[in-house]
Amino acid sequence: MAAYHALGYQDAPFSTDSAAAIALTDPLLTGRPNHTILMSQEPYQTLTFIEWGGDVPTPFAAPGWAAMEVLVKDLDALFADLPPAFSLLNPPAALSFSEHIRAMQVAGPAGELIYFTEVSGEVPGFSLPTATQQVNQCFVMINAVTAIETSIDFYARLLGCAAPSAMPARVSILSRSNGLDEDHRHAIAPIALSPGQLFELDQWIERPAVAGQHPPCGWHSLSIRRNTPPPEGMAPAPAVITEHLHCYDIATPDGERILWLCPHH
């Protein structure tokens, strides 16, 4: 936790209706030490860390949640003063499709892949947030998918948004971890979650599986709050019911876990 406190994050308050409390009802997580930080007040966003005995993962080793993109005010200042628990993978550089977005890729203490990103101007076709503190909210969750067109259709139906077209973009960590030239273009697609909040779908590159390997550290789930239940047929009956909330465990194309939280109706 010291690494994230060094970025300026504070601890989040706990409640039985919190996303963390609901996610921790998973029997796999029973009794595991955990801690939750507040990433943003508006939109309200928390990040929960759970102690897990698996190995440190290789980026993009498996399909599913692969990285979080975190908004920062001054990327060069963070680069110059990155807490030592984070390992630099790529220094600040403009994205291949916009000079107004610069990102720095790092690995966190448990190998978690983070894109620290500065937005310096408008990007046509995107509604992007403005940082309110030096290291701020996660505004993009990156999802490695085995069939990008299938996942585009799925998320457009789930979120009730227009289905984007996949576009070629440089994803240097995905290329590097698969022995490709880092200028290689991969198919990616942004999916609008809410204003200033996105999913990025990255076409995954299959790797040989290792039989019997203990699951590594990684992302357990992503919780989102909505005003209504998910579209019919996209989740079974509520998996968890609290005094005020229903929680639906969304059945996704590649098994990436989404907990859909909504009020009782």
Show the residue positions of the predicted features.
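Generic structural signal for well-ordered beta-strand positions
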Residues: 112-114, 199, 256-259
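Core segments of cupin and vicinal oxygen chelate
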Residues: 1-44, 94-97, 143-196
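Short beta->alpha transition motifs characteristic of CBS
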Residues: 117-123, 203, 260-265
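Vicinal oxygen chelate
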Residues: 1, 31-82, 102-107, 137-147, ...
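A short, acidic/glycine-rich surface segment
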Residues: 19-24, 54-58, 122-127, 171-176, ...
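Surface-exposed beta-loop interaction hotspot
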Residues: 94-95, 100-154, 161-170
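Short N-terminal edge-element motif at the start of the domain
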Residues: 83-96
